[in-house]
Regions:
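Contiguous, well-ordered alpha-helical segments that form the cores/surfaces of helical PPI scaffolds
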Residues: 12-22, 145-155, 183
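Acidic, glycine/proline-rich low-complexity segments that act as flexible tails and inter-domain linkers
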Residues: 1-12, 21-39, 44-48, 54-141, ...
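Intrinsically disordered, low-complexity segments enriched in Gly and acidic/Ser/Thr residues
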Residues: 159-160
Length: 194
């Protein structure tokens, strides 16, 4: 049973997701990261959030977010080993599993649609998006979906937002949390997309 109380951690994560996708986050983003640190959010949770912002707002957003984390909370990063064939297989399997969990009965339709746009886009969605990024540790699946809702609302991507509003509930986020994440993102909206 998911925790029904809205936590400081969730509040900070959805606010940071909305701020993190804005192209001019700058000092405001740094202050928000400082606040998250004071609120005792783990640094890893912020790094994970920064990495996943690449999926919604591209590498510039991820770079600037992680730059704010590094400025506020310096740390050494560990060297990474090269991915093995088994890693790629696991990312594919875990990505398919998580995507199916988020999209529920709409999973097969989503995959067919993405393939119709371009088979590479479908593969990248599963492997890079769901497998390599969203199945990592540091954040729960529900926290990742709430951050996704906030980021998509801030960016104004209504189609994708609708799917992830439902997906967040499917992975265990209470509806009240999903609505709060959406409202947080909408308050931070920086674009005029319809």
């Amino acid at each position: 049973m998911p925790n029904a109380s809205w936590t400081v951690r969730r509040d900070r994560l959805v606010s940071l997701a909305a701020l993190g996708v804005a192209p001019a986050g700058g000092p405001r983003l740094v202050r928000a990261v400082e606040g998250a640190r004071r609120a005792r959010l783990p640094r890893r949770a912020l790094v994970e959030l920064g990495l996943m912002l690449r999926l919604y707002a591209g590498y510039p957003a991820a770079i600037e977010f992680l730059r704010a984390v590094a400025r506020t909370w310096p740390a050494r990063t560990a060297a990474r080993r090269h991915a093995s064939y088994e890693d790629w297989q696991r990312w594919q399997r875990d990505g398919e599993r998580l995507c199916r969990r988020v999209y529920g009965n709409g999973y097969d339709r989503l995959r067919a649609f993405m393939s119709s746009l371009d088979p590479d886009l479908d593969e990248w969605m599963i492997l890079e998006g769901y497998g390599k990024t969203l199945t990592r540790g540091g954040l729960t699946v529900a926290e990742r979906e709430l951050a996704t809702v906030s980021a998509l609302a801030a960016l104004g991507w209504s189609r994708q937002l609708g799917a992830h509003l439902e997906g967040a509930v499917r992975v265990g986020a209470p509806l009240a949390h999903v609505e709060r994440a959406r409202r947080t993102g909408e308050r931070c909206r920086w674009t005029s997309r319809p």
